[in-house]
Structures are given as C-alpha cells and as structure tokens.
C-alpha cells in the first residue's frame, strides 16, 4: 500500500467546514468525490486537522492510502478538473509508508486577517474581520507575548471542545501592520477548537482599550472561558501551513 499526500487550498465560505457533516456540504466530501472520479473508486482522506465552517486554508494537508498510485500529476491536475473554483489541490506527493497527515505534524501556522477601515471592503469581507475602531498594536503585541509558551489554554477553547488535555504550546504570535490590514500570525504545536479565534478576539479587545494587556495572564491562570475575549469571526482565519519533520518524498 502507498501513501499519497495532498496539500489543499480552499475558500471555506460555502462549506460546513473541512470534515464531513450530515447537515451540509464539507470540503472533505467535495475532494473525496473528485478523487473518486480520477481513481475509479472511493478513497478516504485523513487530514492534519479540521477547520470550522467559514474558515479557509492555504495549506491543509491530507493523505490517503492506495494499492496502486497514479502519477502525481493525476492527483493535481486530474482532481482539480472535478473541483469547484473554491477548492484546489496545490500539490501531491508519494510519501514514506509511515507518513500520517495528523500524527506526523509538528506544528501549524494560522493567519488571522483584520481589515481596519471606517468603511467595509466588499472585496475583503469573505476573508477578513472588518474592525472600524483604531487598534493599539503595541498593546496587542504586549498581550500576545503572554500567550507564547506552553500553557493551559482552557480559557481559550470553545464550549464544545472535547480535547483530552487543554495544554498546548504556542511558538509565536506576531502582529503584522500592513496599512489597512493587520495580520495575526499564530504558530504552535496544535490548537484547541476556536483557540486561535478566541486569542484574536481577546487581542482585539486589548487593542480597542477594553482590556489591559496584562489581563491575558490572569485568563490563562483562571482557565475560565468567560474570562477571555470574544470569538473572532470565522472568515478571517486561514490555515497557512502544516509543518513536518524533514522527510523525503518518494515521488512528487
């Protein structure tokens, strides 16, 4: 059996998320159906994680197992022929037998996009959070530094999160000032459900002056969701990259 890895980009706006759901169309379902047309039969994708409804991805990683792999071009160009405009396979590679999209991952990079302007942008609204108020980026950076490291992020998870442990390691939180745009780049070993969006919502509240930066430390220590900030809207979040230890492709 051979392991094929796909890197998938998608606009999550019209989907219920990455994972198959009984109540709507998911990115996983659409990609698996396109893959079945190319391969002549069903293949189940195992992803590096899941994204919620409305969240986007530049670098979602998924793998599947097949007894007779096709040329990698068939999984790129071939599958893309059957995908809608909102989804594309960016890369395909034949991997070592022990590669696993989820369990081989050593880190993830999420970017949250904030559009700051008194007037909304129709061209940006699908991929950003429109914030009309002025943001104190220095205060946001001060608060962001407190989130870096290995902590119990119980205060930064969704109420329905069923993770066995709420301890995670955040490698970095960078606030990037780009004229009308503010990007919050978060890198870590892994994240709880809605963790990045709650982190961003909290940082925006700090930037608006609604909370002092040092309050973030109390949130981490308290572990109560009610202490932390709002959950930033889904459309501003994008999974940029999933990191793996150096590993040679068999073919790609």
Swiss-Prot record:
GO terms for molecular function: RNA binding; tRNA pseudouridine(38-40) synthase activity. It comes from the Bacteria. One of its GO terms (biological process) is tRNA pseudouridine synthesis. The active site is at 52 (nucleophile). InterPro entries: PsdUridine_synth_cat_dom_sf, PsdUridine_synth_TruA, PsdUridine_synth_TruA_a/b_dom, PsdUridine_synth_TruA_C, TruA/RsuA/RluB/E/F_N. Substrate binds at residue 110. Its EC number is 5.4.99.12. This is tRNA pseudouridine synthase A.
């Amino acid at each position: 059996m051979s392991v094929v890895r796909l890197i998938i980009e998608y606009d999550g706006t019209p989907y219920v998320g990455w994972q198959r759901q009984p109540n709507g169309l998911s990115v996983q379902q659409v990609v698996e159906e396109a893959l079945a047309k190319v391969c002549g039969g069903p293949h189940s994708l195992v992803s590096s994680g899941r994204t919620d409804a409305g969240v986007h991805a530049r670098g979602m990683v998924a793998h599947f197992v097949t007894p007779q792999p096709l040329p990698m071009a068939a999984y790129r160009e071939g599958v893309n022929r059957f995908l809608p405009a909102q989804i594309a396979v960016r890369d395909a590679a034949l991997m070592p037998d022990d590669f696993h999209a989820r369990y081989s991952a050593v880190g993830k990079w999420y970017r949250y996009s904030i559009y700051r302007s008194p007037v909304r942008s129709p061209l940006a609204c699908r991929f950003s959070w429109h914030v009309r108020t002025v943001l104190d980026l220095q205060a946001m950076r001060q608060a962001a530094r407190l989130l870096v490291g290995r902590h119990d992020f119980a205060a930064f998870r969704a109420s329905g999160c069923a993770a066995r442990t709420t301890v995670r390691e955040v490698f970095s939180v960078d606030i990037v000032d780009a004229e009308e745009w503010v990007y919050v780049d978060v890198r870590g070993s892994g994240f709880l459900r809605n963790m990045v969006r709650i982190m961003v919502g909290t940082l925006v509240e700090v930037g608006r002056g609604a909370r002092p930066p040092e309050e973030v430390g109390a949130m981490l220590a308290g572990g109560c969701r009610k202490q932390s900030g709002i959950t930033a809207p889904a459309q501003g979040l994008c999974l940029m990259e999933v990191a793996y230890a150096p590993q040679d492709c068999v073919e790609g």
